[in-house]
Every structure is written in structure tokens, then in C-alpha cells.
């Protein structure tokens, strides 16, 4: 799952990005949330129901300062709807390898640390999916990632911080 903007670029660079992300199995998500992200969540559910895996970054964007920000609840919703476990992954070193604005990654190493699965009971009706339950599961994911990565956790959405920084 990747931001929809990767699939909407113009010119040769835009076409290349769309081709690249599509060829490696990335599908677009409208990160503005709510009903606008439903087609991506539907696609993700279909992948999980086939017994396959996919990745989702709960922050929804790159961290503006290397800290770990509040997660969005899409992964929790998918887990509740499908009963699939969530495997938290801390990815370390990407900030140094490809700082924002660089086109070609620098040489270096990244590390992926896999956490213990978070098992969620599948629910049978939308009434069982409460905001509180979604937040509880999402917070468990971000706590696990923070523990593995050593990142400071910020209880605020990264996009909100980015917007404030650009004012």
C-alpha cells in the first residue's frame, strides 16, 4: 500500500513511479482517510482473505523528525474484519539512507526488526468495531514499534506536525 500521489505523477518521472510501484505490488491509498481510503482497504482485505501478506505503515507518512507518530487505524480495522494477526515491523536506518529530497539513496544499511504478532479476534458486525478498540490495537502496534526501534513516541499525527512546520 502506498500513497496515491505515487500513481498520479505527470511526465516520464510520474509514469516511471507508477510503473515501479505497480510492478512491485504496491497499490494506491488515498491518505485523507474515511470513505476515500475504502477502495484500498477493500483491496487489502482481498489480499488477506487469499492468505497473502502486505505492508502498511500506520503513520501514513514519513516522520518529519525521526520520532514515531500516532498511527492511523486502517491496519487495526483490517485485523478486526479478517482475524489476521498484525506483525509490527520496525524499520531502522531509512532516514539516513534516503533523507527527504534525495533522489538516489545513499550507501548504508537498513534493518527490519519483526515484533511478536498481535492477535485480534475477528468480529462479525460493524457495531463491534468501535473507535476505542481501533485506537487500542493501533496504539499496541506503535508501542511495539517504538520498543523495537528506540524511537520516541509522539501522540500526534505526523501529517499534523508537517502542516504546522510548513506554516
Predicted regions mapped to residue ranges:
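Catalytic core of membrane glycerolipid acyltransferases/transacylases, capturing the structured
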Residues: 1-34
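Non-catalytic C-terminal accessory region of glycerolipid acyltransferases
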Residues: 38-167
